[in-house]
Swiss-Prot record:
Gene assigned in the entry: argG
UniProt EC number: 6.3.4.5
SUPFAM superfamilies referenced in this protein's UniProt entry, alphabetically: Adenine nucleotide alpha hydrolases-like (SSF52402), Argininosuccinate synthetase, C-terminal domain (SSF69864)
Family matches, as PANTHER family: ARGININOSUCCINATE SYNTHASE
Reactions catalysed, as given in the entry: L-citrulline + L-aspartate + ATP = 2-(N(omega)-L-arginino)succinate + AMP + diphosphate + H(+)
This protein's GO CC annotations: cytoplasm
Protein name in the entry: Argininosuccinate synthase
Annotated TM spans: none
Functional pathway: Amino-acid biosynthesis; L-arginine biosynthesis; L-arginine from L-ornithine and carbamoyl phosphate: step 2/3
Length: 420
């Protein structure tokens, strides 16, 4: 452990974990001053109010950093990569490196000797924060992990010290909210057999009798730039689609998530805008990319998603993957209309000047295909298609028949026929 006698910048939410960390960083680690850093990546206003009230009650200097634009930019990179992990669009994972960088910047500006977080030793966030911080010369402190703290111990400690812990973590669930997603975990949801109550959802209404709605999303170079003809910045565009699609109950995920440390956890997510944008983007790619590009890009997208899940968005491999993603997305320019209905989002129309599509070639009402190719020219292809499989199956059948003769089963059958 460091000797202290300096200043430490703490990732500060005002919840139980970080409130307890403020006290422990002074008592157990010997730091003279703790600076609380709260980073805005699209959380609701009440979270900032609670963090401010808690910081004031603790006598902690608080810094609030607006990183919504940076986070929205990273979300757009995720759209270009069709990014998801086991069916969830990486909202929490994408936010952590953005938050970590903002905290590190404040720590360096304020002359801190260390940075700290309140993550447990069981989750992913400790790794995502520290992958950014350990690239600096500052000490990294993780009190909850290093001291083996439990929620029960933290509550008892907070009561003993008279720490203000009414806000933040006071509810039944652990909730994390940003522009791209809202996650809900803990309490009875830790039992995979428990059916979640409807009241855990805040962004998405129950998909019921609401009339279907068509939404048009316009892309330039793979990045969504307008909704229903209205040009919007990244933050505003995501916020609008969260409301618009959330009203139709779109973007709910209930999953068993495999964390980086090997633990399985039950997670519930809400991500209306992410669902719409990823669906629309993939539909447009299907129109403008060749078959080979789509097949290979699916592998690249999956690898990018893995690096993003790990919080390694600045890794050299991630940059190399993005070079391919950016190159293919230069043609992902056009408009996709999606239908929002009953909790589902599906593309119903797509247009682009870069469409790798010929209506006349694909039409059942036209004789010729294109470039002098006719339907009859497919006969040779049809004869060869599956030839290797047919040949392999024939050789296998012949080998089985030969084996039957060798082991005597074939001769026995023949003698029986003769006797009859």
């Amino acid at each position: 452990m460091p000797e202290g006698n300096g200043t430490v910048a703490l990732a500060f939410s005002g919840g139980l974990d970080t409130t307890v960390c403020v006290s422990l960083l002074k008592e157990e680690y010997g730091y003279d001053e703790v600076i609380g850093v709260t980073v805005d990546v699209g959380q609701p206003d009440y979270e900032f109010e609670e963090a401010e009230e808690t910081a004031e009650a603790l006598g902690v200097e608080q810094h609030v950093v607006d990183a919504t634009e940076e986070f929205a930019d990273l979300c757009m990179e995720a759209v270009k990569a069709n990014a998801d992990y086991q069916g969830y669009p990486l909202g929490t994972a994408l936010a952590r490196p953005v938050i970590a960088k903002a905290i590190l910047s404040v720590a360096e500006d304020e002359g801190c000797s260390a940075v700290a977080h309140g993550c447990t030793g069981k989750g992913n966030d400790q790794l995502r924060f520290e992958s950014v911080w350990r690239d600096s010369d500052l000490d990294v402190i993780a009190p909850v992990r290093e001291l083996g703290l439990t929620r029960e111990w933290e509550n008892e400690y907070a009561a003993e010290k008279g720490l203000p812990v009414e806000g933040g973590d006071g509810g039944r669930y652990s909730i994390d909210t940003n522009l791209w997603s809202r996650s809900i975990e803990g309490s009875e949801l830790e039992d995979p057999s428990t059916i979640p109550a409807d009241d855990i959802y805040k962004w998405t209404d129950n998909p019921s009798d609401k009339d279907a709605e068509l939404v048009e999303v316009e892309f330039e170079d793979g990045v969504p730039v307008a909704v229903d003809g209205e040009e919007l910045g990244g933050v505003e565009l995501i916020e609008q689609l969260n409301k618009q699609a959330g009203a139709h109950g779109i973007g709910r995920t209930d999953m068993m998530e495999d964390r980086m440390l090997g633990l399985k956890v039950r997670e519930n997510y809400e991500h209306p805008a992410a669902t719409v944008l990823l669906t629309a983007h993939e539909a447009l790619e299907g129109l403008v990319l060749t078959q080979e590009e789509r097949q290979f890009k699916a592998q690249v997208d999956q690898e990018w998603s893995q690096k993003a899940y790990q919080g390694l968005v600045d890794a050299p491999l991630t940059g190399a993957l993005e070079a391919f993603i950016d190159d293919t997305n230069e043609r992902v320019t056009g408009t996709v209309t999606v239908k929002l209905e009953g909790g589902h989002c599906r593309p119903v129309s797509r247009e682009s000047d870069y469409a790798v599509y010929s209506e006349s070639a694909a039409s059942f009402n036209e004789e010729d295909v294109s470039g002098g190719i006719t339907q009859q020219d497919a006969t040779g292809v049809a004869k060869y298609h599956g030839f290797q499989s047919r040949l392999a199956n024939k050789i296998l059948d012949d080998a089985k028949k030969g084996a039957a003769v060798t082991d005597g089963s074939g001769d026995h059958a023949a003698s029986e026929d003769t006797e009859e």
